[in-house]
Amino acid sequence: MEDFVRQCFNPMIVELAEKAMKEYGEDPKIETNKFAAICTHLEVCFMYSDFHFIDERGESIIVESGDPNALLKHRFEIIEGRDRTMAWTVVNSICNTTGVEKPKFLPDLYDYKENRFIEIGVTRREVHIYYLEKANKIKSEKTHIHIFSFTGEEMATKADYTLDEESRARIKTRLFTIRQEMASRGLWDSFVSPREAKRQLKKDLKSQEPCAGLPTKVSHRTSPALKTLEPMWMDSNRTAALRASFLKCQKK
């Protein structure tokens, strides 16, 4: 799985995910399913934001090849992927500027057009189950929830999917591609089933020679995925370096 992640995802995303896991005492080389899940979630957040702008009239537009002279503002503020302090600073700034209610938990995005925070979910299970879990945790009608699955299903608050159909289709296609690539390598079943993943993990650990500095016990703490990472982009070109590798995995 680790090799797959490094082949399939942009190196910047891999670096962010590695830093998040190591900060919480988790090893990407051991907890490879979590490694893959964090990379996937971060990539979906980028894709959700990518190409969406607000013009000088306040209208939402899609621009795939940017005009440097255009007065455009990113429609979405990416909160996911920043270190925790910076993320809360951004959230507080948005709340002070717009008057929206401050969320109890760090959301993933802010939508300047709809004036609401967004929580993005990517699940290997039934979308409605994961949606209810998210809603129960957040306990706020102000934060919009949008869940995607690897099977092409999605669920959003009040069936409001925020993005146009084509933009959502890009995300669904990417997730389906990840699933197919995992399946072709025999990785999908263990990625979906925690029980199978634990069995595979024990098998992998037994096959490894003892290594200095390598944790011998897997951490089961839940890390707030990517919430404590350093900000990697702060201007209008923040997603440009990632776009080329978003749509498909590298060939095996």
UniProtKB/Swiss-Prot annotation:
Source organism superkingdom: Viruses
MF-aspect GO terms: RNA binding
Keywords carried by this UniProt record: Decay of host mRNAs by virus, Eukaryotic host gene expression shutoff by virus, Host cytoplasm, Host gene expression shutoff by virus, Host mRNA suppression by virus, Host nucleus, Host-virus interaction
GO biological process: viral RNA genome replication; viral translational frameshifting
Annotated positions for site Important for efficient shutoff activity: 202-203, 206
Active-site residues, Swiss-Prot/TrEMBL: 80, 108
Site (Important for efficient shutoff activity and nuclear localization): 195, 198-199
Localization: Host cytoplasm; Host nucleus
Alphabetical list of InterPro entries matching this protein: PA/PA-X (IPR001009), PA/PA-X_sf (IPR038372)
Chief location category: host cell
Job description of the protein: Plays a major role in the shutoff of the host protein expression by cleaving mRNAs probably via an endonuclease activity. This host shutoff allows the virus to escape from the host antiviral response. Hijacks host RNA splicing machinery to selectively target host RNAs containing introns for destruction. This may explain the preferential degradation of RNAs that have undergone co- or post-transcriptional processing.
Stated family: Belongs to the influenza viruses PA-X family.
Domain comment in the entry: The probable endonuclease active site in the N-terminus and the basic amino acid cluster in the C-terminus are important for the shutoff activity. The C-terminus acts as a nuclear localization signal. The C-terminus is recruited to host protein complexes involved in nuclear Pol II RNA processing.
Name listed for the protein in its UniProt record: Protein PA-X
Organism of origin: Influenza A virus (strain A/Duck/Hokkaido/8/1980 H3N8)
